[in-house]
Amino acid sequence: MEKIKVYELRNKTDAELLKQLEDLKQEYASMRVQKVTVTSTSKLSQIGVIRKAIAKVLTVYNQRKREEARKQYTKISEMPLNMRPKLTRAKRRALTPKQLHLKTIKQRKKCENFPKRKYALLV
């Protein structure tokens, strides 16, 4: 078994990915049985390669599913927590840009009645 290239996996359909995942899992199970029963280590080094291949297939499949789910939530204001961008705790609690630019009535009146003075120098 040779290493699986991720760019090749991205070209496959979901059904093909699931079929390949099933095949890899069966092969992995048979390798583990071989590891216990047979003492020769000729193909046992392939266990790591198969495990990594399974991880790659699952990664591509899950990324695709998450992208589809993200497209569904583009028009909805509330998004599930696991779909939101990963931010620090402080950034999650920070004010939104709209909230930052809001002014109180008193502050607005003060700005209207006493605008910032502009000076121009004649040269």
Curated annotation (Swiss-Prot):
* Matches recorded under Pfam families: Ribosomal_L29
What InterPro entries does the entry give?
Ribosomal_uL29 (IPR001854), Ribosomal_uL29_CS (IPR018254), Ribosomal_uL29_euk (IPR045059), Ribosomal_uL29_sf (IPR036049)
From the Swiss-Prot or TrEMBL record, give the protein name.
Large ribosomal subunit protein uL29
Organism equals Babesia bovis
Q: Which PANTHER family match?
A: 60S RIBOSOMAL PROTEIN L35, LARGE RIBOSOMAL SUBUNIT PROTEIN UL29-RELATED
Coiled-coil residue spans: none
* Domain of life assignment: Eukaryota
A GO BP term, please? translation
So what family is this one in?
Belongs to the universal ribosomal protein uL29 family.
Q: What GO terms are given for molecular function?
A: mRNA binding; structural constituent of ribosome
Q: Which GO cellular component terms are attached?
A: cytosolic large ribosomal subunit
Alphabetically ordered keywords of this record: Ribonucleoprotein, Ribosomal protein
